[in-house]
């Protein structure tokens, strides 16, 4: 259930809370199934170019809104797939990867360019972006997990959550 469902006051009257998550899911899935959602490129372009570093939730949001304003947007992602934490940090049982992939396809059709395997600050110099774009937006995720100084932390089989989820998801996507 969505976080608000536990505190929903409709339950006081009807006996159950409003199933917000399920309602929203049904609406969006119906819209996709019936073809109501389609690419809507901006009517005009500003001539400005923006580099977005990172394709996680914030990077995708920034890219979408800047593109809608008419800017040419290029998203740089260090991983081999777009989506950041959405793609690698959330298990498929919670967020099916096809949901992310279909949204990316719409964004591409609207004019957003995605470049994967592009490690900005590594193989791609930051100066290259600063010189090649009118603006650069940093939406990079935390690559290094925070370690805990607790007994057993270094035991066999103890992993950082995002590292573990990334490994499992990558193996599923590559199979």
Which residues does each PLM region occupy?
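Ferredoxin-like iron-sulfur electron-transfer modules
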Residues: 1-3, 36-53, 58, 87-88, ...
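N-terminal Rossmann-like dinucleotide/flavin-binding domain of flavoprotein oxidoreductases
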Residues: 3, 23, 86-134
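Glycine-rich FAD pyrophosphate-binding loop
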Residues: 71-87
């Amino acid at each position: 259930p969505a976080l608000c469902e536990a505190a929903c006051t409709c339950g006081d009257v009807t006996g159950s809370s409003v199933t917000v998550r399920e309602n929203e899911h049904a609406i969006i899935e119906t819209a996709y199934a019936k073809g109501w959602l389609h690419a809507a490129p901006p009517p005009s372009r500003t001539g400005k170019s923006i580099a977005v570093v990172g394709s996680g939730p914030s990077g995708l949001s920034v890219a979408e809104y800047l593109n809608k304003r008419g800017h040419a947007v290029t998203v740089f992602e260090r991983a081999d797939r777009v989506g950041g934490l959405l793609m690698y940090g959330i298990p498929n049982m919670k967020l099916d990867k096809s949901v992310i992939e279909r949204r990316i396809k719409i964004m591409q059709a609207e004019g957003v360019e995605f470049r994967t395997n592009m490690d900005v600050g590594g193989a791609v110099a930051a100066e290259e972006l600063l010189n090649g774009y009118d603006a650069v937006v940093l939406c990079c995720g935390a690559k290094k997990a925070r370690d805990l100084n607790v007994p057993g932390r270094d035991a066999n089989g103890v992993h950082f959550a995002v590292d573990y989820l990334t490994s499992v998801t990558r193996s599923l996507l590559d199979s």
